[in-house]
Design a protein with these regions (language model features):
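A conserved acidic beta->alpha catalytic loop
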Residues: 23, 34-43, 80
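Short, basic, low-complexity termini and linkers enriched in Ser/Thr/Gly/Pro
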Residues: 248-259
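Conserved donor nucleotide-binding strand/loop of the catalytic core
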Residues: 42-70
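Cell-envelope/extracellular polymer assembly enzymes that use nucleotide-activated donors
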Residues: 3-5
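Catalytic metal- and UDP-sugar-binding loop of GT-A-like glycosyltransferases, i.e.
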Residues: 33, 55, 77-81
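Acidic helix N-cap motif at the loop->helix transition within catalytic regions
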Residues: 18, 39-48, 88-89
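Short, well-formed alpha-helical segments that are part of the catalytic scaffolds
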Residues: 8-26
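Catalytic-site signature of metal-activated, phosphate-bearing donor transferases
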Residues: 62-68, 74-77, 86-248
Length: 259
């Protein structure tokens, strides 16, 4: 069996890190890369007996690539602190690495717990993520948002879900939407994208219809309706912030440490 390192990058994840580490306990090596936590995250991780490195925050992609470089083994599973590897996925990972895997990277479906339930509708699911990969043939890429692993050659796909505790409540979701819509607008602006009233008017209702009707958000009741409305608002906010950047490019440039 090929040995595995699970990498976790952290910043003030005291509420999550212990459970994340416990879910990865089957791995041969667990590495936490912390970027200056002040809430006891590092002490909790070290108390679990895992390796902990500290490094100044330089962005999601750079931190995750650094973690992979510092791993003890070539096969990596990149786990966020608010995610859990349940037993079914654990067994599938071990079975995949038991022989010589035919692919250098594997996507996993991710299911999110929000508003009191596991959401298997809307754009929340299956939310495929490439998390299991061989570091010699794959690398994290991206700018401000939508970071992902780029694999040399085709990728495989696992069947069992990675669990994601996405938001603590609606207030948390609103705060994150505000933050990530700023980064998304900045990324679009720097890539040359521009917008106007037509896009701002059309994209939010289109996003709502896609999530609530086409992606069957209605099957999740009020939770599905709320998620669909939040998604529409997020899309609208992103385009409105892009429009604001066009008018005043310095108005929405967050400090790099806030990313």
């Amino acid at each position: 069996m090929h040995p595995l390192t699970v990498t976790i990058i952290t910043l003030n994840e005291a509420a999550h890190i212990a459970d994340a580490i416990d879910s990865a306990s089957f791995a041969d090596d667990i590495l936490v890369v912390d970027s200056g936590s002040t809430d006891g995250t590092v002490d909790i991780a070290r108390g679990k007996g895992v390796r902990v490195l500290t490094r100044e925050w330089t962005g999601y992609v750079d931190q995750k690539n650094y973690a992979a470089e510092q791993a003890s083994h070539d096969w990596i599973f990149s786990l966020d602190a608010d995610e859990r590897i349940p037993s079914a996925l654990r067994d599938e990972i071990r079975a995949t690495l038991a022989d010589d895997p035919p692919f250098h990277g594997y996507r996993v479906p991710r299911v999110s717990f929000h508003l009191g339930r596991w959401i298997r509708t809307t754009d929340f699911y299956p939310d495929y993520q490439t998390r299991l990969y061989h570091r010699r043939f794959a690398r994290w890429r991206g700018r401000y948002v939508h970071e992902s692993v780029t694999v040399d050659g085709p990728s495989g796909q696992l069947k069992n879900d990675l669990q994601h505790y996405s938001f603590s409540d609606l207030r948390d979701q609103i705060q994150r939407i505000n933050h990530y819509s700023t980064l998304a607008a900045r990324q679009m602006y720097e890539s040359g994208r521009r917008t106007g009233p037509v896009e701002i008017a059309i994209h939010p209702p289109a996003a709502f219809l896609r999530n609530y009707i086409l992606r069957k958000g209605f099957l999740d009741g009020t939770a599905g309706l709320t998620i669909s409305l939040m998604n529409a608002w997020s899309v609208g906010l992103k385009f409105m912030k892009l429009w604001e950047l066009q008018r005043s490019p310095k108005s929405q440039i967050p400090n790099s440490k806030s990313q």
